[in-house]
């Protein structure tokens, strides 16, 4: 079984979500059932993100290291891998190679 390479029958919010002075840029995709995902790119560097809802981050290309709030351990993720972040939390991300990602809100 292969992963889907596109999303069909969706709406895209035209205005970009721009964070950290342009180091992270994404667009919101709205599905027919009202659920949302963001598709984005994070440039190399170290950032700290906060979450409202739980998230599943799927790495499409690039490489990063992640440290979840309350942990001292860093984990490395690359293309084809994913990681989960709890809701109402924070995580550190160290982008080693420009990151292309899909974020699903759980």
Curated annotation (Swiss-Prot):
Catalyzes the phosphorolysis of diverse nucleosides, yielding D-ribose 1-phosphate and the respective free bases. Can use uridine, adenosine, guanosine, cytidine, thymidine, inosine and xanthosine as substrates. Also catalyzes the reverse reactions. It comes from the Bacteria. The keyword Glycosyltransferase applies. InterPro entries: Ppnp, RmlC-like_jellyroll, RmlC_Cupin_sf. It catalyses: a purine D-ribonucleoside + phosphate = a purine nucleobase + alpha-D-ribose 1-phosphate; adenosine + phosphate = alpha-D-ribose 1-phosphate + adenine; cytidine + phosphate = cytosine + alpha-D-ribose 1-phosphate; guanosine + phosphate = alpha-D-ribose 1-phosphate + guanine. The gene is ppnP. Pfam families: Ppnp. This is Pyrimidine/purine nucleoside phosphorylase. Belongs to the nucleoside phosphorylase PpnP family. GO terms for molecular function: guanosine phosphorylase activity; purine-nucleoside phosphorylase activity; thymidine phosphorylase activity; uridine phosphorylase activity. GO terms for cellular component: cytosol. Gene3D superfamilies: Jelly Rolls (2.60.120.10). It comes from Paraburkholderia xenovorans (strain LB400). The lineage of its organism: Bacteria, Pseudomonadati, Pseudomonadota, Betaproteobacteria, Burkholderiales. Disulfide bonds: none annotated.
């Amino acid at each position: 079984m292969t992963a889907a390479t596109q999303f069909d029958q969706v709406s895209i919010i035209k205005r970009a979500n721009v964070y950290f002075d342009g180091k992270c840029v994404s667009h919101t995709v709205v599905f027919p059932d009202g659920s949302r995902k963001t598709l984005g790119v994070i440039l190399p560097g170290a950032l700290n993100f906060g979450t409202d809802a739980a998230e599943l981050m799927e790495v499409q290309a690039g490489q990063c290291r992640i440290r979840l709030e309350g942990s001292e351990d860093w984990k490395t993720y690359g293309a084809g891998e994913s990681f989960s972040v709890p809701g109402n939390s924070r995580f550190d991300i160290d982008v080693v190679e420009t990151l292309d990602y899909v974020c699903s809100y759980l």
